[in-house]
Curated annotation (Swiss-Prot):
GO cellular component term of the entry, any: cytosolic small ribosomal subunit
Similarity-based family: Belongs to the universal ribosomal protein uS9 family.
InterPro entries per UniProt: Ribosomal_Su5_D2-typ_SF, Ribosomal_uS9, Ribosomal_uS9_bac/plastid, Ribosomal_uS9_CS, Ribsml_uS5_D2-typ_fold_subgr
Gene Ontology terms for molecular function: RNA binding; structural constituent of ribosome
Keywords: Ribonucleoprotein, Ribosomal protein
PANTHER family assigned: RIBOSOMAL PROTEIN S9, SMALL RIBOSOMAL SUBUNIT PROTEIN US9M
UniProt record, GO biological process: translation
Name of protein: Small ribosomal subunit protein uS9
Lineage: Bacteria, Pseudomonadati, Pseudomonadota, Alphaproteobacteria, Hyphomicrobiales
Length: 155
């Protein structure tokens, strides 16, 4: 390692050490990422195309029937202003529909940044690249649920 003699040298050394975000694409021209939310895990592939979104072999509007879930899934594409430019294929397992939609959104955001590193700042600012670590709190013994106590009778 180079000898750092002043603070100016330290600044240039840290700039050189910062990893540049490079494009990660497989032999078929796709970017791959995994997304997680609650107990759901999604594997997402992104490639240039007409804007088709397939989730577990179905059209995303058929798989996620509720409009709120469809909106959650499309948020990264809309935020990046890339609507209709990518074909997205996702397989998702575990959890319920809300967790699965969040997992696909997380994986899609990561895959978009791998395909187009310039989108990273926009998606990071929107909070799409951050893993939502909130999970259900476990039930404790001596309690009805995680925190709710059994009904108490004074007399």
């Amino acid at each position: 390692m180079a000898d750092l003699s002043s603070l100016k040298d330290l600044g240039t050394a840290s700039e050189a050490a910062a990893p540049a975000h490079v494009r990660k694409v497989d032999s078929l021209g796709r970017s791959y990422a995994t997304g997680k939310r609650k107990n759901a895990v999604a594997r997402v592939w992104v490639k240039p195309g007409s804007g088709k979104i397939i989730v577990n072999g179905k059209e995303f509007a058929d798989y996620f029937a509720r409009p709120v879930l469809q909106m959650i899934l499309r948020q990264p594409i809309v935020a990046a202003a890339r609507d209709g430019q990518f074909d997205i294929v996702a397989t998702v397992a575990g959890g319920g529909l809300s967790g699965q939609a969040g997992a696909v959104r997380h994986g899609l955001s990561k895959a978009l940044t791998y395909f187009e590193p310039g989108l990273r700042s926009v998606l990071k600012k929107g909070g799409f690249l951050t893993r939502d670590s909130r999970v259900v709190e476990r039930k404790k013994y001596g309690k009805a649920k995680a925190r709710r106590s059994f009904q108490f009778s004074k007399r």
